[in-house]
């Protein structure tokens, strides 16, 4: 691991297979949906209106988009007519708000894992209407000897954590390779190969088998096309890309068949990684070596701080750092850090314009620190699901866009985590 002093602490984090390796202690997350409760926070004054009925949607172990699709189908409503502020975790018990035009009448739903409750009127909800989220998270499987260390961590939790984009943002990244970066560098074949051959364990067997076949027979598009027909593959992405490659063997042209939603995901993943790297570099200027802790994740390492000087905290708590976008003029500290990170990536600012078919890098600013509000820390109790172990529940609010899992990592620095297997 280069550029990490031996004085700095290092932990290995693997969110993708839902386990985290640290000092030899254990904890368990999401053993049941009620262990991870998420509640949307919205300003009802800002969404005031009379065009739609406003509903509270409570779901358990269901993805938001699947819940929306179910509601649309059940009540014969076009999916586009369901307004929402954000998407919520699947493996959780979540509450969020949706709006549906009044012309569809007053709706109600009360099923074991899905409940729709009419609570009033509003305008049509959009993603920007979300203020934040309230989390109530129960951590289980704790050993008695680890409790003093955890208590020490919790004392400093009010100072928050770096506001990193967490692993959930990087589902399209494999072996630390970004599709967007490969496109920028003109490696179109590699970009297509990542897309057509790499897969997550959670993908359907039909698609995993297809990707393994494509990988094994890479370049033999006639043979791959026959496999697609024989196995009745319906996905337009694979059908159209392989058909184009069979016809022209043009990898750049094949990428044009990727839908816009996926293209945005690829660009956002790389831009988010670059932002993480910039913030990590910035924090090195403020955090002494002995207070640094590193976690390994899909894209490299994330640097946390064990504690932070109050004077430094006051400097950073409201400070923002911009995303990297080629059409923006940066200056001072920001320019210095961005140039250093791009140099490490083997890129220039101008080359980011080569993103081409995938879209563009969008400029925005994001707070450097994620600071939990209304933080409540429960007592250590006997864990009824893990004999001889302990549990604790944390409750806190975060601004929209911040990841609850980052705060959990900060709270349990030095504790080995094992999440529920999917």
From Swiss-Prot:
This is Probable tRNA pseudouridine synthase D 2. The keyword tRNA processing applies. Residues 160-371 form the TRUD domain. InterPro entries: PsdUridine_synth_cat_dom_sf, PsdUridine_synth_TruD, PsdUridine_synth_TruD_CS, PsdUridine_synth_TruD_insert, TruD_catalytic. The active site is at 89 (nucleophile). GO terms for molecular function: pseudouridine synthase activity; RNA binding; tRNA pseudouridine(13) synthase activity. Its EC number is 5.4.99.27. The keyword Ion transport does not apply. Pfam families: TruD. Could be responsible for synthesis of pseudouridine from uracil-13 in transfer RNAs. Disulfide bonds: none annotated. HAMAP family: TruD. PROSITE patterns: TRUD (PS50984), UPF0024 (PS01268). Keywords: Isomerase, tRNA processing. It catalyses: uridine(13) in tRNA = pseudouridine(13) in tRNA. Belongs to the pseudouridine synthase TruD family. It comes from Methanocaldococcus jannaschii (strain ATCC 43067 / DSM 2661 / JAL-1 / JCM 10045 / NBRC 100440). One of its GO terms (biological process) is pseudouridine synthesis.
